[in-house]
Every structure is written in C-alpha cells, then in structure tokens.
C-alpha cells in the first residue's frame, strides 16, 4: 500500500464523518426560510412551540433523516452491484431492482389504492424481490454462480420493460400520476417520521450485511475463478449481496423514489480516495453518499423551493466529478 493511500485512509473516514455532520446541520438550518441554530436546537430538545419549530420537526428533520437513510442505502447498493456485475458503470437501477420497486408501488396505487408507508414498502420489497429473482434466474450459470454479463443484460432489459409499464400505468391513471409524479422524479420531501421508521430496521440489517461482506467482495472483485481458488464461497456471496441490494434499493425507492446516479458515482469516488479494498471503500461510500444527497437537497431547496428535485441536482453536481475521476483513472492507466 502506497504512503499516499495510507495517509488518505487515515483522514478519509473522520473527514467524511465531519462533512456528513455539517451537511446534516445545514439541512436543518437552510431552506426557503433560514432558521437560527437556537431554534433548531430548541425544536430538537422539545422546548420550543413556535411555528419555526414546526418547520424543523415536520419538514426538515424528516427529509434530513430520509437523505441519510436513502443515501447510505443507495451508495452501498451501488458498490455491491458494481462488484457482482464486475461492471464499473453499474448502479442500483442496472439490475432492474429500482424499476421493480417503482413498478410495484405504482401498480399497488393504481389497482388497490395503496398510499401508506407500510403498503408502499411492502409493494416496493415485493417488486424489488421479484425483479431480483428474475434477473438472478436469467443471469445464473453452472454451479449456482451468476454470470456478470448475463446479469447485466437481463437487468437492463427488465428495467426497460418495467419502466415503460410504470409510465404507462401512471399516464393512464390521473390520480396515480398526480400522487406519484414528484415521487418518481426522486425527492426527499418526507412529511413524517413514520415512513422512515418502517424502513429503518431493514436498511440497518442490509447495510450491516454489506459491510460484513467486504472481505468476500475483495476476493470476488478478482473474478469468480480466483475467488473460488482463494476459498471464497462465490455463489453464497453473490446471493447474499443480491438480497442486500434488493432490501437497500427497495427501502430507498419506497421512501424517496428512484434516485439515480449517486449509486454509480460515489463508489468510484470512494475507491479513488482509499483504494479498491472494500474494507475501506464501503465505509467511505456509506459516509459520502448521504452527504452528497443532503447537499444536493439543500441546493434544490434554496434555488427553487419545492420544485427542483434532489435527483436532478445530485446528477448536476456529480456528473463533473465522475468525469474527473474517469479521466484521472484513464490517465493513470495510460
């Protein structure tokens, strides 16, 4: 390990943790109406009864926690997906998991009128699980292992079909369209904490599972044959990883909608900072992705309050960063 990577690793986790704390604080303080820190502290401590405290507790706190939860889930899911498919361009939408969750939520709203947090979460998990099973069955090969190429092709094809069906159902049902048009664009505009309580435990379990897979992912990143030779149980790692992706993507999609791009970009940034060792890159991804999502949400709230979606802002911020990382890697490999 080079000295520069060792130094970067020593400062990356505490530095990103500080950045995440700053993003969380700013998310509570800044919006269409900026609030003093004293009001935020009083609201969080339960000693304030003013209208400003209502803004903090009913609007900013839920969306801040949603950004933390969904950001961490999407970042870890992206890192897992890039390893399972051995595709550096993979993101949580590549295997059709996001599309499956979105389709199931829209279908539930159109056919059964599902709109509560529990109902949407159940539909999101069901859709994500069915999509994962279809893709895994299509992408499987001998020995129970998954073929990265077949997995990617099956995921892209399934996502295209489900996205078309989702759009068709929403357009043919005005009530569903009005209910879900902002959600489908990706938004942290969560108005209560109950929605987050529903997904908290599944996300924590799946996130912890992803972190525990770090050693196995290091072996798997070298290829299935090499991982098997090193004693890694490839099929088991792939199955557990796919289940973790399903839970992480299903939970995030149920809460904030299908937010793309950050699950693609942040694992690249993490590997650029601390190297390809997943024991380091996964924790860095877990800290950096929510920070980016919160900063994107803050910018959207300030520029066009209530209209500019966080998914658009995160893509606008992240695209130049991803281009920089790709060009730097290309030059380094030249």
How would you describe each model-predicted region?
Residues 1-334:
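Alpha-helical transmembrane segments in inner-membrane proteins
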